[in-house]
Amino acid sequence: MPKGKKAKGKKVAPAPAVVKKQEAKKVVNPLFEKRPKNFGIGQDIQPKRDLTRFVKWPRYIRLQRQRSILYKRLKVPPAINQFSQALDRQTATQLLKLAHKYRPETKQEKKQRLLARAEQKAAGKGDTPTKRPPVLRAGVNTVTTLVENKKAQLVVIAHDVDPIELVVFLPALCRKMGVPYCIIKSKARLGRLVHRKTCTCVAFTQVNPEDKGALAKLVEAVKTNYNDRYDEIRRHWGGNVLGPKSVARIAKLEKAKAKELATKLG
């Protein structure tokens, strides 16, 4: 058999020599050796993380956290839910500023007053009883009586009374008797006004002539926000807000349903 000739193909030009950049090698000290950490179970000490979620908190903290979550998860009836709508900060500041002028006297002040009166009497100047100055009236029973007798000009209720049943009837009573009422944040702030740790509610009965204009303005703002909106407030339920896990689970189910429906429809 004759030998077949080899087909000569075109030679491809050699690639131009690529000038390689000389990378400067890092000088490694042989005395420093790598010790990579292994954060597996039972291996190296774990790095510092935010472990707030896993802390065993004191009982009172645990309870207040659970209560706040329950108020979000459960359906809260309008009578209780209305206490989540507190007065805005600006109006509340004005209200507290006015209320501060009508704080009841402390035990020391009363002692001083009676002592001065006794000294006057001993000096033979005669004992003339002084007129009682207008002060804030505090406490559920006192305020309820004042509202029923229509003697209260403005009622201020704390939003975080515990148990809430103590004051849950007050907004309805105030509205029925035509007394302006408002809900303000923190029973401690009201307590400070009347020299106590906390206070459920306070009421204005009388004010000095120079403060009547300021009180009238507050009453007008309060009526617009609470008394006039009573029908709207008593329709609004609260809570029923799911947590992130439940939201994620429902979203996953919805996604799966949508996918299944899409495959059925083709």
Curated annotation (Swiss-Prot):
Coiled coil spans: none
Span list, region Disordered: 104-135
Keyword Cytoplasm listed: yes
Localisation per UniProt entry: Cytoplasm
Skewed-composition ranges (Basic and acidic residues): 104-130
Electron transport found in the keyword field: no
InterPro entries hit by this protein: eL8/uL1-like (IPR050257), Ribosomal_eL30-like_sf (IPR029064), Ribosomal_eL8-like_CS (IPR004037), Ribosomal_eL8/eL30/eS12/Gad45 (IPR004038), Ribosomal_eL8/Nhp2 (IPR018492), Ribosomal_eL8_euk (IPR001921)
Entry superkingdom: Eukaryota
A Gene Ontology term for the protein's cellular component: cytosolic large ribosomal subunit
SUPFAM superfamilies xrefs: L30e-like (SSF55315)
Main location: cytoplasm
Binding partners and assembly: Component of the large ribosomal subunit.
Function: Component of the large ribosomal subunit. The ribosome is a large ribonucleoprotein complex responsible for the synthesis of proteins in the cell.
PANTHER family registered for this protein in UniProt: RIBOSOMAL PROTEIN L7AE FAMILY MEMBER (PTHR23105)
Family statement drawn from the similarity comment of this UniProt entry: Belongs to the eukaryotic ribosomal protein eL8 family.
Protein name (Swiss-Prot/TrEMBL): Large ribosomal subunit protein eL8
Species classification: Eukaryota, Metazoa, Chordata, Craniata, Vertebrata
